[in-house]
Regions:
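C-terminal and late-domain segments of enzyme folds
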Residues: 108, 238-239, 252-265, 269-271, ...
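Internal gly/pro-rich beta-alpha loop/helix module
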Residues: 125-236
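Phosphate-binding active sites in nucleotide-utilizing proteins
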Residues: 240-317
């Protein structure tokens, strides 16, 4: 089985571009690849999904123990001929930027994957070898097995490849040229989502064409051939006992594939709906999940869907088990100011008014602790979470305590009760008791309302 992790020395080096190019080329070659993302990012897996037509999974060593990550990787790789992991940020950048824990290197080390380093040789030649030498020798083993040049001309590749191979003792496996016609734009939370990129499939095809032409496939495939990961014994998915409505559209698109799988494994049927377009919730539901996304970019359309706003408010107030993260939390507030500064009424079950803070707010990983029992949490428990948002609310809640793992910054957040969780923190549900608790609350609600 072909297995590797793509990494770089920094963000913005073209990891996502290279990942999509290689995935598409592997797909053309009949390898039936699957994809993974190191860390908590939601957007890059959307591009993997656009290439493959199947889910891409997140593997995060802050969210999950090593054995859980290995199991998630094996489960996702089962039945595929290639598994491609995309790293996050710089190769060794982990918690707080001062630790290698939860870094791309940590993931490669945990899974035993060869690493292909994506390098953009802008304004450098021999100095590039010195920098790469530092990356290779910073940790032992580094797992770095090869180099891929990005935004590189054929002429520069001919010059750099033999020099880097001589200095580093590592193979240069090819390059991608600059492709202005295949550029994917970005905004305040990173890249545009895959659904928003015009002519995405044509851009992906251009990337794959370039990869076919300029990558040394025989060497890459030979270098990255490994035994498939061992799949732990998987319990059978139980029959669905309750329906959970999950918001999914352009405004609410930040849901981990593993979370939805965990809902199903807990006995729930996942039923998607669009807060932008559907005028009512799905019928006979026992729970409601509102993930994050970009509601601030669609505030007017969300606000004008008044029949759905009214129904969600009524159902939550009548006890419908509900979990709302980040953008979902904003949706449940009193109002949401859009990117143009216009304020729009929202569901109104929470007191806060939200607007652009003009900066990243409480960015990064944290541990979320509960003081008392509620639908999802038990007193004294702590769960890993992350926050990633520019919008903030006048009422973020005070029910839970959040604390960063590095530096110790702490704050109160979230609103909870026996049928409710809402807050800025994104939860990672897989491998925790949270899906079972949510499904149980949904079953109880359904039983009381049938």
């Amino acid at each position: 089985m072909i297995q590797f992790l793509l990494a770089a020395s920094r963000s913005g080096s073209g990891k996502t571009t290279m990942t999509c190019a290689l995935l598409m080329a592997l797909k053309r070659r009949g390898c039936e690849p699957c994809a993974f993302k190191s860390g908590p990012d939601y957007i890059d897996p959307m591009f993997h999904r656009a290439v493959l037509g199947v889910e891409s999974r997140n593997l995060d060593l802050f969210f999950s123990a090593p054995e859980t990550v290995r199991a998630l990787y094996a489960k996702g790789a089962a039945g595929h001929g290639a598994a491609v992991c995309e790293g996050a940020m710089g190769f060794y950048d982990g918690l707080g930027g001062v630790s290698d824990r939860a870094s791309a290197w940590h993931l490669a080390d945990t899974l035993g994957l060869p690493v292909l380093l994506v390098v953009e040789p802008k304004g450098q030649s021999l100095t590039l070898a010195a920098e790469l030498n530092g990356l290779v020798n910073f940790r032992t083993p580094s797992h770095i097995a090869g180099i891929l040049l990005n935004n590189c001309t054929a002429r520069m590749h001919v010059l750099l490849a033999p020099m880097l191979e001589k200095e580093m003792g590592l193979p240069v496996l090819g390059f991608l040229p600059k492709l202005p016609e295949a550029v994917i734009g970005s905004r305040h939370l990173g890249l545009y989502t895959a659904a928003e990129v015009e002519n995405l499939q044509q851009k992906l095809a251009l990337l794959a064409d370039a990869a076919e032409e300029h990558i040394d496939w025989p060497r890459l495939l030979a270098l990255c051939e490994k035994e498939p990961p061992v799949l732990p014994v998987q319990p059978e998915t139980p029959p669905a006992r309750v329906r959970i409505a999950v918001a999914q559209d352009e405004a609410f698109c930040f849901a981990y594939a593993e979370t939805l799988e965990a809902f199903r494994d807990a006995g729930a049927e996942v039923v998607f709906f669009s807060p932008l377009r559907d005028t009512a919730l799905p019928e006979n539901i026992g729970g409601l999940y509102l993930p994050g996304g970009y509601p601030e970019l669609h505030a007017r359309e969300l606000s004008e869907n008044t029949s759905l706003l009214r129904e969600i408010k009524q159902k939550i107030e009548s006890g419908l088990p509900t979990a709302a993260e980040c953008g979902g939390f904003l949706y449940l507030g009193q109002s949401l100011t859009d990117a143009e500064g216009q304020s729009w009424p929202m569901v109104g079950v929470l007191p806060g008014k939200a607007k652009d803070a003009g900066r990243l707010v409480r960015f990064g990983y944290a541990a979320l602790s509960a003081d008392s029992d509620s639908m999802l949490f038990r007193a004294g428990e702590s769960f890993p979470i992350h926050e990633f948002h520019h919008w903030d609310s006048t009422a973020n809640g005070t029910a839970l305590a959040a604390k960063k793992p590095v530096g110790g910054a702490a704050w109160r957040c979230g609103s909870v009760n026996e049928h409710f969780y809402a807050g800025f923190p994104h939860l990672y549900w897989a491998g925790t008791p949270l899906p079972q608790r949510f499904a149980a609350a949904a079953e109880n609600y359904r039983r009381d309302h049938d």
